[in-house]
Regions:
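Short, polar loop/linker segments at the starts of domains and inter-domain junctions
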Residues: 56-61, 128-133, 318
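N-terminal phosphate-binding loop and flanking beta/alpha elements of the actin-like ATPase fold
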Residues: 1-40, 76-219, 233-254, 269-270
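Glycine-centered helix-coil hinge/cap
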Residues: 55-58, 95, 103, 257, ...
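Extended N-terminal export/anchoring regions of large proteins
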Residues: 26, 32-81
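Hydrophobic residues embedded in beta-strands of well-ordered beta-sheets
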Residues: 18, 28, 51-52, 227
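Conserved A3 ("GATE") glycine/threonine-rich loop of ANL adenylate-forming enzymes
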Residues: 13-17, 225-226, 256-263
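Phosphate-binding glycine-rich/basic clefts of nucleotide- and phosphate-handling proteins
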Residues: 41-47, 53, 70-71, 233-317
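A phosphate-binding catalytic loop at a beta-strand-loop-alpha-helix junction
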Residues: 222-230
Length: 318
């Protein structure tokens, strides 16, 4: 029996989309992730929130190293049993398939879009951190399996892009929390070795291949959740250096991205069509907050308040 070879991938775990690439004859090659596309929208769905944790354990033997992950798994199995929910191998869906399933039956499907947006949120309780870790792990595991189905080798090493500042108001603490979630999730998904690279630096490497002399290059990376800028020295003398710290002249990032544009458009253009700005029968202006909570998809408290209203309305109908 031959020895199974292993390899590494470049992994873009994005707020809006995910992609992975491998090196083939010194050239990066994107792998297909969904319906012939190299992009997988950062979405997943399951019958319940708890189904994701049980799916990882029951169908993929994903380990639960921490006490909080183990407690989350026990609660998940008990909750699914109480609701008579059987977690099957295809119970968790990803990308556009998850969106289609959610649209067909929104009241019976647990749907998450852009989980990366929440990783740096302040005030997350340990059980919430454990849940986000499971959500990220499920997506990474799915992507890893999709990639390995196209390769003769197993993948156990990953270079993962990360923004300079994750979304959140906690500064360095938020960045450490978010990267910790990504790193633990990647290890649990089967990546033995995991390293991180600032996304603007990674984006600039492709441009560097076209340079014949050293240049100062400003790289602007506008993503779904963040906008990052880096000023780099680039050129032939830097290409083969593994450590690019000396070439990084400066970097900065803000927690504003494509999701914020989507939120602003939905709030200004869509919410008025759904009643925002209206009045009660007595002529009192309706509060704006419920409509804001509906569109603020990167705000955990706002989304919690919005879905509490939805659940209360469902109970009243029942």
């Amino acid at each position: 029996m031959g020895i199974l070879q292993t390899m590494f991938i470049g992994f873009d775990y994005g707020t809006a989309n995910c992609s992975v690439a491998v090196m083939r004859e010194n050239t990066p090659q994107l792998l297909t992730l969904e319906n012939g596309s190299a992009l997988l929208p950062s979405m997943l769905c399951a019958p319940t929130r708890e189904a994701v944790s049980e799916w990882l354990y029951r169908h993929h033997d994903v380990p639960t190293h921490s006490d909080e992950n183990q407690a989350l798994l026990r609660r998940a199995i008990a909750a699914n049993r109480d609701e008579d929910i059987e977690v099957l191998r295809n119970s968790v869906q990803f990308g556009l398939a998850s969106l289609q399933q959610y649209v067909e039956d929104p009241e019976e499907v647990y749907f998450v879009k852009s989980p990366k947006s929440f990783l740096g949120a302040s005030g997350l309780k340990p059980q919430q951190v454990a849940l986000f870790e499971d959500l990220v792990c499920a997506m990474m595991l799915h992507i890893k399996l999709q990639a390995e189905s196209q390769l003769p080798e197993q993948i156990d090493q990953a270079v993962i892009g990360r923004p300079i500042n994750f979304q959140g108001l906690g500064g360095d603490e938020a960045n450490a929390q978010a990267q910790g979630i990504l790193e633990r999730a990647a290890h649990r998904a089967g990546f033995r070795d995991v390293v991180f690279q600032f996304e603007p630096v990674a984006a600039g490497l492709d441009f560097e291949a076209t340079l014949s002399e050293e240049k100062r290059v400003l790289v602007v990376d506008i993503g779904g959740g963040t906008t990052d800028c880096s000023l780099l020295l680039m050129g032939p003398q830097w290409r083969k250096r593994a450590d690019r710290q000396q070439s990084l002249l400066g970097h900065s990032g803000c927690r504003i991205g494509g999701n914020d544009l989507d939120i602003a458009l939905a709030f200004k253009c869509l919410m008025p069509l759904l009643g925002m700005g209206g009045e009660t029968e007595k002529g009192t202006a309706l509060p704006i907050l419920p409509w804001w909570n509906a569109v603020a998809i990167n705000d955990v408290p706002a989304q919690s308040d919005f879905y509490k209203i939805g659940r209360a309305s469902c109970r009243e109908r029942v």
